[in-house]
Amino acid sequence: MNKIRTILVACCLLPVFCSCGEVAKRMDAKLAESKAAIGIVENTETDGVGESSLASGGKKSSATAAADGEYTDLEIPARLTSVPEQILRRTGYTVSYNSNRRVPNWVAWCLTVERLTGNSKRSDAKFHEDTDVPEPRAVDFDYVRSGYDRGHMCPAGDNKWSALAMGESFLFTNVCPQAPQLNRGDWNEMEQACRKWAKQEGALYIVCGPIFYKNSKKTIGKNRVSVPDAFFKVVLCMTGEPKAIGFIYKNGDGNRPKGDYANSVDEVERITGIDFFPALPDEIEDKVEATCNPDDWNI
């Protein structure tokens, strides 16, 4: 009887293990498709403008790292076809750069507790132009007396783990003209919230960037760096029950609770035209992107 009971239990559990294995395999396949679509090829070094340097930034090498709660490149959005896109792979993040606007389309990175610790200091780094993109490109003088801050997309505070990562976070391809009230206020508070979530929840997959409305024409500086109308941020957590949330901030004054900026990822996709987290299995992607529940994030 015990043998029969053991066999029955094993038979019941087998579909569960098979299901988990199938999800991992599909994620591996979709990750490979996503990276290939935007020109990211594993173990390829930078070879000039437009190529992708694959510094791993300390992440696992495959989606099979799910067992440790971290997937490689799960944060990378789908390829953009309606705007210029040059993919730049940095130590701590990946950029989709728009040469017409001189700012990123998006910046994506994985945030973990390990990345929040280290001796690298913001004070040791300076903003500098990115020579991996063609001229005209943003330079420091474009921001002087412009009325806008040099607003990090992937924040310096998420790159304390590496001096190289910290320095690269100050490249102007990771920067947008940002209203001082936003950069030093609600946007900064959201960056701090993401660090808190990473410590409490585990690895986060984050994408953020500028939003330009139809008639956006404002620029700053000699190089005509485009000034965004708003900014977005989407956050995915795969620890336990997968969940995601989006945020949209106007590029101006603001002093409101985080929940006031919250949106579903689907809504952020509708506004930006960007397909986020395409490597997720469809059943997971559809579920987490349709949901906006600030209570899940304690906001």
Where are these regions (language model features)?
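Domain-level detector for secreted/extracellular nuclease and nuclease-toxin modules, and
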Residues: 8, 15-299
